[in-house]
Each structure stands twice: as structure tokens, then as C-alpha cells.
């Protein structure tokens, strides 16, 4: 296999380093903004040197972002090249277009590292769904958020924990995609499309991040025997899919509560096989690069071109997803009064309320400048 590598940052450099030990998978050209000693004569700053080279049969895209990644992936496929990517942003935004094009051109399109980093999640999901019905996918899918929450449990502030995460390379300089939820949302969206063999758009999934979490919120939940995580969940029942990303509280001793630091836990619930979970590093140079290399080996072994066949829109109805919440706010609002089950100091425990309704209410408070925090309490069947 002759490989063209689009991008030589953290992941791209890791892929190149791993592949030096495998003569069967040869990186023959590297696109980067600048050359290094490791690239030597393979360096180019022109994408066409890779995309138009007939000797290159597989392209690895690890640039990040939607553009020009989408255009270059598409051009590679039209040239009859297989594509492996770790770029969740472009896969989520252009899912149907890229999967359709890979079929049209009869080339492989793999993106295991885009949803799970170093965890072989999508390939495992691909395998189990052939023999069982996937009822739900779920998990703690962002290591940056999990590290921040783990640090805050020790008494530190959100800002201090974020700064530590950035210093360790767990969070980007602009942490918005991590702490506000889009990174988790994209992983859930990709996982849901594959699990339920159809298409759900990013904007069909309600999403909230952890930016409003305070140290005292974690202390309050700890008194209740709960730990906070940024939780992704999607389930299919009676032909309808419900999905959400939001802060959620889990009982101490549960598997999700036990995931600490920058680790991820991703899993699914099967009709016959029960719960299946995977734990590992969801990001990082070599964990992510290793998943890219696994995809390359699958392509070389002529494994399936993609993980699922369906591209038809799924019937999304998030109103069927109802949860109890713990809410901290100074607002006095008729809706809040209506859903209050009990008051506990600065916090309110709600009656079960639909996720879209709660998210809309929280967004309206924030739009008015009212500070608010909310943690869902998912039903046990969602995670155990």
C-alpha cells in the first residue's frame, strides 16, 4: 500500500512513526506546512502532489476542520483512492456525501479514530450490529471534559482545570468544541448513524456542555452519591431515535462514574447481547494514530468499505427522552415551578421532563444572562 498523508501534526506524525515499522504500508508523500527531517524527500506543500499521483492508492486525512478536508477527501475518492480519516468534524458535517461517494467510486472510507480516538469502537460496533440489534449507544466520549471534571472534584475551579488540561495537551487552545459539547455530539452522531443504519444530523441532537459547572455543583452531587459526566446517549425504539448530549449524574460505583482523568467509556446496549462497553484513551498522538493504522490494515485486507449501508434519514423524536434534573438557578419562572419536585438548598430536583424542553428552558435563561447549571439523572437502563 502506498499512502499519501494529508497533515503532519500530532496524529499525522504518530501515524508516520508507527508505519515506519511496517514495510507493507508505506507513506510515500506527506503534505505539511513545513518540512522536517522525518519527512525528507516525501515532503510537499501541494495537495495535488498526493491527489493526482497514480502510485498512491490510499490517502490518510488528519488535517482537522471541514474545509479543505472535504474537498481533498472527495478528490481522492474520485481518483479511485481509499481514504482513512480521524477528522470527526468533516465526517459528521459531510457524512452522507462522503459515504455515497465512496460507494459510487467503489473505494474504502474508514474513520474509526473519529469516534473514540484510540478505542476500536466503530469497528466493534460494525461487527456486533451484523448479528444483533443495537438498541442504544452511549458513553463518556470526551477525555478533555472528563479530565476537567475529575480535577474539579478535587476542589479546583473550572478555569484552573481547563488550563491544566490545555497544558497536558488534553484540550485545544480554543476549547469550545470540547467543553461546549460539539466534539461529543459529532462522535454520537457518527455512532448513531452506524448503529441504527441511517442518518441523523448534528442539529437534530440537543447538546449542552460543561462550561457552567462549578465546584460546588460537584460537591452537592457528591453528597447525593453522584458523580458528574458529559454524557452522550442515543436509542432507537419503535422506529424512533432519541438522542442527547448533556451533563449527567451517575451513582458512585457505576462504570460511568468510575471513568476518571482523560479516559473515555463508550458502549452499546444490544437486544440479545446486553451491554458492551469499551474503555481507553479517547485522544492523544499514538492512541489515535493506532486506530488510523488499524483502518489502513483493514483497507489492505479488503475489509468492508464502510461500517453501515443506510443513508436514509432516521425518524428522530427527542421528546420521548424524559429525565429528572438537578438545577441550580436564581431564576423564578413558571415553567420551573411547574416541574419542581423538591427544593434542596440552592438546587431544585425536577419531575421527569423531556430533554428538548429542558434544554430550551436553560437556553432561554442563559440568553437573558441568568446563570444556570443542570445535571440530568438518566434512568439506569441508559448505562447499566
Regions found by a protein language model. Name each.
Residues 2-17:
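Glycine-rich adenosine-cofactor-binding loop
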Residues 134-141, 146-152, 164, 170-175, ...:
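Catalytic, metal-anchored helix/loop core of enzyme active sites in primary metabolism
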Residues 119-134, 148-158, 186-200, 295:
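Oxidoreductase and adenylate-handling cofactor-binding alpha/beta cores
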Residues 162-265:
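Substrate-binding/catalytic subdomain of NAD(P)-dependent oxidoreductase enzymes
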Residues 21-39:
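NAD(P)-binding Rossmann-fold cofactor-contacting core
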Amino acid at each position: 500500500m502506498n499512502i499519501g498523508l494529508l497533515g503532519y501534526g500530532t496524529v499525522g506524525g504518530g501515524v508516520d512513526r508507527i508505519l515506519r515499522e511496517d514495510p507493507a504500508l508505506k507513506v510515500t508523500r506527506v503534505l505539511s506546512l513545513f518540512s522536517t527531517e522525518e519527512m525528507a524527500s516525501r515532503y510537499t506543500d501541494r495537495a495535488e502532489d498526493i491527489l493526482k499521483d497514480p502510485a498512491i492508492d490510499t490517502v490518510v486525512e488528519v488535517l482537522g476542520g471541514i474545509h479543505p478536508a472535504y474537498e481533498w477527501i472527495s478528490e481522492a475518492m474520485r481518483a479511485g483512492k481509499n481514504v482513512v480519516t480521524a477528522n470527526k468534524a468533516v465526517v459528521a458535517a459531510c457524512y452522507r456525501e462522503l459515504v455515497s461517494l465512496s460507494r459510487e467510486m467503489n473505494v474504502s472510507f474508514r474513520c474509526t479514530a473519529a469516534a473514540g480516538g484510540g478505542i476500536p469502537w466503530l469497528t466493534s460496533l460494525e461487527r456486533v450490529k451484523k448479528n444483533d440489534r443495537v438498541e442504544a449507544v452511549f458513553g463518556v466520549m470526551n477525555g478533555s471534559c472528563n479530565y476537567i471534571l475529575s480535577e474539579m472534584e478535587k476542589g479546583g475551579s473550572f478555569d484552573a482545570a481547563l488550563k491544566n488540561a490545555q497544558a497536558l495537551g488534553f484540550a485545544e487552545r480554543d476549547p469550545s468544541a470540547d467543553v461546549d459539547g460539539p466534539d461529543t455530539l459529532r462522535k454520537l452522531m457518527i455512532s448513531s448513524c452506524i448503529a441504527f443504519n441511517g442518518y441523523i444530523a448534528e442539529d437534530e441532537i440537543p447538546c449542552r456542555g460543561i462550561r457552567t459547572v462549578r465546584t460546588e455543583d460537584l460537591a452537592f452531587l457528591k453528597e447525593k452519591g453522584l458523580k458528574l459526566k458529559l454524557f452522550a446517549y442515543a436509542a432507537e425504539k419503535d422506529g424512533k431515535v432519541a438522542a442527547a448530549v448533556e451533563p449527567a449524574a451517575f451513582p458512585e460505583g457505576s462504570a460511568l462514574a468510575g471513568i476518571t482523568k482523560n479516559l473515555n467509556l463508550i458502549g452499546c446496549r444490544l437486544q440479545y447481547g446486553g451491554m458492551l462497553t469499551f474503555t481507553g484513551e479517547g485522544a492523544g498522538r499514538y492512541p489515535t494514530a493506532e486506530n488510523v493504522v488499524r483502518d489502513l490494515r483493514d483497507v489492505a485486507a479488503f475489509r468492508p468499505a464502510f461500517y453501515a449501508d443506510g443513508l436514509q434519514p432516521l425518524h428522530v423524536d427527542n421528546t420521548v427522552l424524559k429525565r429528572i434534573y438537578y438545577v441550580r438557578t436564581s431564576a423564578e419562572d413558571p415553567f420551573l415551578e411547574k416541574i419542581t419536585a423538591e427544593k434542596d438548598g440552592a438546587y431544585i430536583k425536577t419531575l421527569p421532563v423531556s430533554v428538548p424542553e429542558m434544554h430550551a428552558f436553560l437556553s432561554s435563561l442563559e440568553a437573558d444572562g441568568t446563570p444556570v447549571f443542570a445535571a440530568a439523572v438518566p434512568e439506569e437502563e441508559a448505562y447499566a
